[in-house]
């Protein structure tokens, strides 16, 4: 089947890499399994716990990708018995067969749906993997690597060198861009160039970790991870001195000092070793630097090694949130609304209403005290804990609020002012991208071969000399010939002498 990043099935299966999408900025990667390898002791088998509930993997298997999965109620009481298998067994239990017990433990229980909580089951893509991968180093996010791959002219069948694999975000994106088939051991009828990613990493543990991820994701045949110091040893595959050239068309350097590695990215290395670049095509390069001083040194070195079309770009990616904003005293209880006077007139009307209600409340208290004859007696409280005067005043306030709010035929989703704001949390970082192009090397042999394939035309000859003439052109030439003949005849006729008058 190949890698799930390149071609996936319609439904999830046992052993697949799945991404559990909880919300826009939270995704959990997991391998779908029935049995719990970590022995957490759940009766339902392998369970993934999130802030939105528990999800046994038995509910995630054989589901269409993109499905909404409801959380389940798991048997947490069985977790206390998870270490029973490691304890010593009694002598009476040694003679009893354990196959039935093992089968009972290996078969997960049937989960029950919980009252709330859900997630979405998604198949892996480079964009989702970037949002959910474990961060080992600085991550190249989707807005950056999409623009980088576009400027590097990466296409199916290209070979790209990546120096500084890090967390593997750019690796997964680039392998999808260059993929045009898997290499096969059988000789093909028509040989074609397959896309490949040659990734180099200086840190040994990170190189081993990215190598394991590439193997788990089924990308071994398309990505070759090498642990090497590219500053000193270059970019050849295998042995640094006598290795094989990757014949790269594109280069991405995510290094602290990319200018130190440019001495190996030339057409003819001074050491006499084979060049890692493709001799039959121009090579595109991009360096990823967080400081402007690094950019200056990189550009200076690129000019020394004959790189052309040098430019620097800074990618600033912002998501714009568009929504309706409701403000006013009549928006109390509306989700996301601002209960505040939207104008001076509304604020003044509210103050006058409050003053009027206070005046009515005081007058009612005085009137009630005069009727009873004792102003110090407290009015009787009702079931709600308030006096009759307070309840009457509250009713007047609610009635006044209802009358001030003018009825509207506009639906609730269309009320308010349409506004847009930039997202508060930007998942990006400051980075400067330097792009350059190294043209193809052109020799005298190449010039002679092209001259033989496309010979130059003779000097003074017409480019349409060998083409047949059309009817219009023949008529035009015949007419021009007649005009020339008439002009020549008029020149040959001598002038007649003038007759004298007698």
Curated annotation (Swiss-Prot):
Keywords: Methyltransferase, Nucleus, S-adenosyl-L-methionine, Transferase, tRNA processing. GO terms for biological process: tRNA methylation. Its main location: nucleus. The keyword GTP-binding does not apply. It catalyses: adenosine(58) in tRNA + S-adenosyl-L-methionine = N(1)-methyladenosine(58) in tRNA + S-adenosyl-L-homocysteine + H(+). Its EC number is 2.1.1.220. It is found in: Nucleus. Residues 385-394, 475-494 have a biased composition (Basic and acidic residues). Residues 403-412 have a biased composition (Low complexity). SUPFAM superfamilies: S-adenosyl-L-methionine-dependent methyltransferases (SSF53335). S-adenosyl-L-methionine binds at residues 167-169, 201, 206, 229-230, 254. Residues 76-112, 365-417, 444-502 are annotated as: Disordered. GO terms for cellular component: nucleus; tRNA (m1A) methyltransferase complex. GO terms for molecular function: tRNA (adenine(58)-N1)-methyltransferase activity. Coiled coil: none annotated. The keyword Ribosomal protein does not apply. Residues 79-89 have a biased composition (Basic residues). Catalytic subunit of tRNA (adenine-N(1)-)-methyltransferase, which catalyzes the formation of N(1)-methyladenine at position 58 (m1A58) in initiator methionyl-tRNA. Heterotetramer; composed of two copies of TRM6 and two copies of TRM61. Belongs to the class I-like SAM-binding methyltransferase superfamily. TRM61 family. This is tRNA (adenine(58)-N(1))-methyltransferase catalytic subunit trm61. It comes from Aspergillus fumigatus (strain ATCC MYA-4609 / CBS 101355 / FGSC A1100 / Af293) (Neosartorya fumigata). The gene is trm61.
């Amino acid at each position: 089947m190949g890698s799930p990043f390149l071609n996936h099935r319609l439904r999830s299966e046992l052993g697949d890499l799945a991404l559990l999408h909880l919300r826009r900025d939270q995704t959990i990667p997991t391998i779908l399994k029935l049995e719990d390898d970590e022995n957490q002791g759940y009766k339902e088998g392998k369970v993934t716990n999130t802030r939105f509930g528990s999800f046994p993997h038995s509910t995630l298997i054989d589901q269409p990708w993109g499905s909404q999965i409801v959380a389940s109620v798991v048997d947490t009481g069985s977790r206390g018995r998870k270490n029973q298998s490691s304890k010593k067994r009694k002598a009476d239990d040694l003679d009893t067969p354990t196959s039935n017990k093992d089968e009972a433990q290996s078969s997960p229980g049937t989960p029950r749906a919980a009252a709330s909580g859900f997630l979405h089951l998604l198949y892996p893509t480079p964009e989702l993997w970037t949002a959910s991968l474990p961060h080992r180093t600085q991550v190249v996010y989707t807005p950056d690597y999409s623009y980088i791959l576009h400027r590097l002219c990466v296409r199916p069948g290209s070979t790209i060198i990546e120096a500084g694999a890090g967390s593997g975000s750019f690796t997964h994106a680039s392998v999808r861009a260059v993929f045009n088939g898997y290499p096969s051991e059988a000789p093909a009828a028509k040989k074609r160039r397959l896309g490949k990613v040659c990734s180099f990493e200086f840190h040994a543990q990170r190189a081993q970790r990215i190598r394991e991820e590439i193997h788990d994701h089924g990308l071994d045949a398309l990505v070759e991870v090498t642990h090497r110091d590219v500053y000193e040893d270059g970019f050849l595959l295998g042995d640094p001195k006598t290795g094989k050239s990757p014949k790269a068309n594109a280069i991405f350097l995510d290094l602290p000092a990319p200018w130190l590695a440019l001495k190996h990215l030339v057409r003819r290395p001074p050491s006499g070793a084979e060049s890692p670049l493709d001799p039959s095509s121009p090579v595109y390069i991009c360096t990823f630097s967080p400081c402007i001083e690094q950019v200056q040194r990189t550009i200076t070195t690129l000019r020394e090694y004959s790189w052309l079309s040098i430019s620097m770009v800074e990618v600033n990616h912002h998501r714009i949130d568009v929504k309706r904003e409701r403000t006013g005293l009549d928006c109390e209880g509306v989700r996301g609304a601002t209960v505040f006077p939207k104008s001076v007139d509304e604020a003044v009307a509210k103050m006058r209403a409050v003053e009027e209600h206070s005046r009515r409340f005081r007058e009612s208290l005085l009137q009630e005290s005069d009727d009873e004859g004792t102003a110090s007696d407290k009015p009787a409280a009702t079931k709600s804990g308030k006096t009759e005067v307070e309840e009457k005043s509250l009713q007047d306030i609610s009635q006044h609020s209802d009358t001030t709010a003018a009825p509207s035929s506009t639906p609730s989703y269309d009320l308010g002012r349409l506004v847009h704001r930039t997202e508060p949390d930007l998942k990006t970082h400051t980075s400067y991208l330097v792009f350059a192009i190294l043209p193809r090397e052109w020799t005298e042999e190449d010039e002679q071969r092209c001259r033989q394939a496309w010979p130059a035309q003779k000097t003074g000859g017409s480019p349409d000399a060998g083409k047949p003439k059309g009817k219009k052109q023949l008529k035009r030439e015949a007419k021009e010939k007649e005009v020339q003949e008439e002009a020549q005849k008029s020149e040959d006729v001598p002038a007649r002498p003038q007759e004298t008058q007698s």
